[in-house]
């Protein structure tokens, strides 16, 4: 397990945090889209009034560490690695507390299988090792989602829900798959949902205890956290090489076990 200082250096070196690959232009475009209540950027959340573009930018500067100056409109943007680590510690404590209660029920889901699956899978295994049940509702449920015109379905790997498109796991912001999972829970409420993108947003909107990961250009979960619908949101680049997440995952696992 890395120390906090070692993890901080690693996050900056691999651009999980620090000077990230997501451009300032892309970040600001997504903040405007969220302020305009674009469904694609809401991740299944409904927001209270008052979240203007400037409000979203100010929140992202506070929660993720992007540049606060609204006049900085192009070029490099940032994620504060210390905010990332603080959120990892908070997430680890929350997961550990749930597992410590015994016989916990958890759901895992990711809309970024090429990146964040590398974090979800070890967490799911850890949960099982500590007596948790991984809920896997709506496996095989399918729908024609937004913008791609063909049917996709929920498939689980290692207890983690993802979208399958003709044999491949795919990126998605959609909230509909998590809504389908919740509809099939049949009264069995998970003690915690660990997710990202629309999977996390829909869970939080439904009132399920939820922790999640989000990139600097995905402000919805941070707004959801500010409104009390998401318990913890970890800011990070969500699509670096999967092996780059290993030290972060080891640090997170250590925080979970410390809280048990």
Question: Where are each of the predicted segments found?
Answer:
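Glycine-rich phosphate-binding loop
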Residues: 180-208, 212-214
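Anion (oxyanion) recognition and catalysis
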Residues: 100, 128, 204
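Generic hydrophobic alpha-helical segments
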Residues: 91-95, 178-182, 248
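Gly/Ser/Thr-rich loops at beta-strand to alpha-helix junctions
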Residues: 109-120, 196-201, 217-219
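C-terminal functional extensions of proteins
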Residues: 188, 211-260
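Short, acidic/small-residue loops that bind anionic groups at enzyme active sites
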Residues: 129-142, 206-223
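Long, charge-dense
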Residues: 119-177
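Electropositive, gly/pro-rich neighborhoods at or near active sites that engage anionic ligands
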Residues: 1-105, 110, 114-122, 255
């Amino acid at each position: 397990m890395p120390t906090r200082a070692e993890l901080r250096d690693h996050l900056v070196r691999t651009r999980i945090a620090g000077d990230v690959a997501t451009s300032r232009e892309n970040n600001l475009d997504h903040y405007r889209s969220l302020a305009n209540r674009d469904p694609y950027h809401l991740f299944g959340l409904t927001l209270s009034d008052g979240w203007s573009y400037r409000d979203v930018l100010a929140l992202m500067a506070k929660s993720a560490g992007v540049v606060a100056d609204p006049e900085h409109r192009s070029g490099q943007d940032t994620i504060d690695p210390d905010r990332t680590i603080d959120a990892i510690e908070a997430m680890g404590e929350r997961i550990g507390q749930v597992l410590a209660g015994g016989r916990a029920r958890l759901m895992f889901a990711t809309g970024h299988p090429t990146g964040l699956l590398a974090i979800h899978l070890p967490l799911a295994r850890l949960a099982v090792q500590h007596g948790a049940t991984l809920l896997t509702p709506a496996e095989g449920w399918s729908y024609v989602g937004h913008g791609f015109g063909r049917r996709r379905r929920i498939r689980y790997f290692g207890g983690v829900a993802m979208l399958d498109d003709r044999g491949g796991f795919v990126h998605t912001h959609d909230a509909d798959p998590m809504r389908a999972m919740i509809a099939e829970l049949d009264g069995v409420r998970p003690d915690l949902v660990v997710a990202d993108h629309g999977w996390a947003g829909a869970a939080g909107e439904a009132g399920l205890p939820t922790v999640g990961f989000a990139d600097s250009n995905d402000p919805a979960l941070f707004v959801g956290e500010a409104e009390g619908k998401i318990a913890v949101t970890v800011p990070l680049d969500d699509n670096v090489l999967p092996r780059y997440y290993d030290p972060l995952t080891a640090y997170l696992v250590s925080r979970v076990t410390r809280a048990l």
